[in-house]
Design a protein with these regions (language model features):
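Glycine-aromatic micro-motifs
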Residues: 1-191
Length: 191
């Protein structure tokens, strides 16, 4: 497979934050430095995307402090996402960094492409979902497994601000719409 689309729904909605997974570096407000991808070029395309489901915040981010955004594709609602067109290699390196692994190994995407959902491990962001298709290429995202056991937790201010910036940047949402959307996600999270 040459290309695919990655659907971002958390801080990766903000393009400059997302591209640190490719080029390497430390996003503004984050505590973690990312090694980057084998192919550091920016995405060949990106666009707004709507997904069925909802986001919620849980666990504790070592990068941002506070809860992390997770995607529940089975919940009612609509998720504002951003689709980035990447090579399969770039996606593998992105996923590795999200899974707190070293980049450099290609993921076997056949299981998720065949079954629409596949867990590559027990941790957060190790469950991949095939959420659709764009221009005859698969759209993939990752989240925690359904039974992850992470406690609901409000997001840290830097993380929340990065998500809000990405929502405005990609979807051109008003501040009021961004606040209402993130408040709804925090309410689901019990925060």
């Amino acid at each position: 497979m040459a290309d695919l689309w990655y659907a971002a729904y958390g801080s990766n909605l903000a393009r400059d934050r997302f591209t640190t997974y490719l080029s390497g570096g430390r996003p503004v407000g984050a505590a973690r430095h990312y090694p980057g991808a084998r192919d550091p070029r920016p995405p060949s395309d990106d666009r707004p995307l709507l997904l069925p489901g909802r986001i919620y915040f849980a666990g504790r981010s070592l990068t941002w402090g506070g809860g992390m955004a997770f995607y529940d594709p089975d919940a009612p609602g609509t998720v504002y996402a951003r689709a980035y067109r990447l090579s399969a290699e770039q996606f593998s390196d992105l996923a590795a960094q999200e899974m707190r692994r070293d980049p450099g190994t290609d993921l076997d995407l056949a299981p998720v492409l065949a079954g629409r959902r596949h867990s590559y491990g027990p941790g957060r962001y190790e469950t991949l979902h095939l959420v659709g298709e764009l221009e005859q290429h698969p759209v993939l995202t990752f989240t925690a497994p359904v039974d992850h056991g992470l406690a609901p937790n409000p997001p840290g201010p830097g993380y929340l601000a990065t998500i809000a910036r990405g929502l405005r940047e990609c979807h051109r949402l008003s501040d009021d719409t961004v606040v209402a959307y993130l408040d709804a996600a925090r309410a689901v999270s019990g925060s």
